[in-house]
Amino acid sequence: MRGCNKKKKAKYIVIVFFAIIILGRFFIPWAIEPENFRDTKNKINSFINRYTIPDSYNAKSLIAVDLSNNNDFVSKRANEQQTPASLAKLFVIDYATTLVDLDDVVLAKNEAISLTKQGSSVANIKEKKYYVKNLFAAMLVPSGNDAAYVLADYCGGIISPKATTSKERIEVFMKNLNEYLKQNDYKDTILYDPSGFDTEAHTTVLDLEEVVMDLLKNEWFKDIVSQTSYTATLPDGSMQTWKNTNTFLDPTSEYYNKNVIGVKTGSLSDDFNLVVLYKKHGKEFLICSL
């Protein structure tokens, strides 16, 4: 009888041993993923390191890049398509640079301005002349949807001089923009509205990473996106000032971070998107979040 009990006990020990191995094999890799047990991990870290527990960050997709070596050191669902919202303007500007120069003069038409959706962000563009660089700044700093329509209208006129209305010119621009995206390997991005005020559009953080890295090669871009507010000098000599929607740049904001030097925010409905350029210890890091 005693020998039988020993065999049963040994059998249970073996079963428990293998159960632990199997559990460890599948559970531990899952548990160490950043999004799993986030609250518990934060509490443990806060106890060990004695810091305040941060709010959980629940981005659907995320990528972080060390620009010194282009290494993606954080990645979460980087290939998953999401709504870009106002970050669509980054692709619009990138394509527009292939058609126009910064000092080109654009007459903002009321026909194009009036296409701006009610309740969306604006740069208070008037029916007057602007430099292309002014319009870029108006799209990047206050995230002006009106500026996006004016730019798309102007560029569409270059592509198709026979187009007779702003709507036609913008449609031509968007069609050619999407062709440009395909040709330049932004394979997971498609846009239908130059302002980004569109729930049908989609992109990925990988495509965002590529377009922003391309734009960051331009000093004018880095200068614009790094400023808390931007004052533009228009062709007629007048000036217009815009406040940046990126509160990380605002010293008066509770979210201010001295290490943030750009780039852009984007929101639509319940989607809050962000592209951050972060500088520390002489290195720059790009964070794209959707």
For every predicted segment, state its role.
Residues 13-27:
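Hydrophobic membrane-insertion alpha-helices, especially the h-region
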Residues 6, 28-29:
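Conserved SxxK-family serine transpeptidase/carboxypeptidase catalytic domain
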Residues 1-13:
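N-terminal Lys/Arg-rich, disordered targeting/topogenic segments
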Residues 186-190, 199-207, 212-290:
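Domain-terminus/edge residues, biased toward the C-terminal soluble/receptor-binding domains
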Residues 5-8, 22, 86:
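Short alpha-helical segments used as structural interaction elements across diverse proteins
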Residues 29-206, 215-216:
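Active-site-adjacent loops and short helices of periplasmic peptidoglycan-processing enzymes
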